[in-house]
Each structure stands twice: as structure tokens, then as C-alpha cells.
């Protein structure tokens, strides 16, 4: 993406970014309208992260701060958020694997905070982040510093980012017990499959750990993940991410 932009004149590159922005925001709205037509219990959707490409890239971050671009994002993302609220569609985002807030490398933490705040800007444009867990932006603990690293990073996040961040247990180093160290700081997402892969058990609703996870949501209806790796579970013609991208 960056290499393609750098090969173009500024006018061509900026026009391409504009076209992608227009397409991707419209795709968000269309997706939410579809999900809003489903039965109430299915009205939830994870939004793709690439809606505004190169947002945190040093050479191109300026583009997203230009007044006309900001004005378009404010106006059009607001329509997306209004649609979701009107149709009672619960929204979430999940920054990628390179968002490692608990890294022991300060530069990686800095970049991870930038990436999380990019997601928060999109969330803020849609009218969320105003209160605790009106939107879910989920990350794994990751990183060698574990729960302590997450707590340190939380202090550096914007109020809106702290309102929307959730932590999910994973199937490798950081499980439910580690997530629960953060239960007083943020909402926890239980991934049943990750827990099964790591511990070889399915957690039961009667389990005290389950209750503590629910309590971390402070009265908000909790979100939960049940992941699996079978690609054929997706209907034909659907993909995880249909955001517009750059040519080769």
C-alpha cells in the first residue's frame, strides 16, 4: 500500500485515498443495514480495520487530518453510527496482531497505542466511546509484559479508547487467569474456544471465573467469542474483509 502510494504523484495518491475512504465507509453502512435486517439475536458485527488505510503511516498520516477529509469522515461515519443505533446492531472492531500493548519494546507499545487510537478515531466518528462499553474494540494481552503492560498502556489511552477497549483470553501464553487480573480496569471477553485449546476444558456458567468476567462489564450486556478455524463455515461469496485496497 505505502509503496504504491509513494510511486504516484501526490494528486493521484490523495485521490486514491479519497476514493477508498468513500467506498469503505459506504461498505460499512451497507453491511450494517444487512445485519440490521437479521433476527435481533444476530445483530452484531465486527467491522474491518482497513477502512482508512495508512492512517498511522508517517508519510501519509497528514492526509487524514486535512479539513475536507475530516469533515467527510465526521458526516459519513455519523450516518454509519446512526444506522447501527437505529437498527440495534452491536458493533465491534479488533485491531490486528501487531497491536501489542503489553510489549517489552517501548517502540512497539508506542506504535500499538497509535494503532489503537486510530480505531478509536473511527469509533469516535461513529458517535461511540462516550460511555463505558458502548462499543467494543478488542485486543489480546500479547507481549511479554502481560497484564502489567496492559495497565501501563491504559494510562496513555484517550478516555474514549479506555471506554471501548476489551481484553480477550488467548490460546497461548495469556489465558483467563491472566485476563482476570484486569477485571477492575476494563471489560473482559471470554473466548470459549481459545480456553478449550489452552486448558482442555469448556468453562461452565457456574464457574466463578465466568461470573467475574461478566461482572467486568459493569452491567453492560457482555460480549463473548466462540472461534473456530473451519474456513468452509463461511457462506460462498463472503469474506472476512471486503474493504477496498490498492492495486499491485
Q: Which residues does each predicted region cover?
A:
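Eukaryote-skewed repeat-based solenoidal scaffolds used as protein-protein interaction platforms
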Residues: 109-187, 193
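Alpha/beta catalytic barrel-like cores
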Residues: 1-90, 99-102, 107-112, 121, ...
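Conserved, mostly hydrophobic/aromatic
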Residues: 94, 191
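Short active-site loop/helix that positions an aromatic residue
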Residues: 196-200
Amino acid at each position: 500500500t505505502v509503496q504504491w502510494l509513494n510511486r504516484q504523484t501526490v494528486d493521484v495518491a490523495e485521490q486514491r485515498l479519497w476514493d477508498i475512504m468513500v467506498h469503505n465507509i459506504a461498505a460499512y453502512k451497507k453491511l450494517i443495514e444487512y445485519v440490521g435486517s437479521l433476527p435481533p439475536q444476530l445483530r452484531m458485527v465486527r467491522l474491518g480495520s482497513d477502512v482508512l488505510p495508512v492512517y498511522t503511516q508517517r508519510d501519509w498520516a497528514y492526509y487524514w487530518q486535512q479539513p475536507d477529509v475530516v469533515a467527510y469522515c465526521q458526516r459519513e461515519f455519523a450516518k454509519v453510527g446512526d444506522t447501527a443505533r437505529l437498527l440495534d446492531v452491536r458493533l465491534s472492531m479488533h485491531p490486528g496482531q501487531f497491536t501489542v500493548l503489553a510489549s517489552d519494546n517501548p517502540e512497539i507499545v508506542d506504535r500499538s497505542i497509535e494503532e489503537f487510537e486510530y480505531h478509536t478515531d473511527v469509533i469516535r466518528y461513529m458517535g461511540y466511546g462516550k460511555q463505558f462499553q458502548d462499543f467494543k474494540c478488542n485486543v489480546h494481552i500479547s507481549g511479554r509484559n502481560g497484564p502489567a503492560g496492559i495497565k501501563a498502556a491504559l494510562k496513555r489511552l484517550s478516555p474514549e479508547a479506555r471506554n471501548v477497549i476489551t481484553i480477550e483470553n488467548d490460546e497461548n501464553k495469556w489465558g483467563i487467569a491472566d485476563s482476570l487480573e484486569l477485571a477492575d480496569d476494563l471489560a473482559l471477553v471470554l473466548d470459549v474456544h481459545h480456553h478449550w485449546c489452552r486448558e482442555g476444558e469448556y468453562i461452565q456458567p457456574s464457574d466463578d471465573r465466568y461470573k467475574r468476567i461478566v461482572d467486568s462489564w459493569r452491567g453492560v450486556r457482555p460480549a463473548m467469542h466462540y472461534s473456530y478455524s473451519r474456513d468452509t463455515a463461511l457462506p460462498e461469496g463472503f469474506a472476512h474483509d471486503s474493504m477496498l485496497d490498492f492495486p499491485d
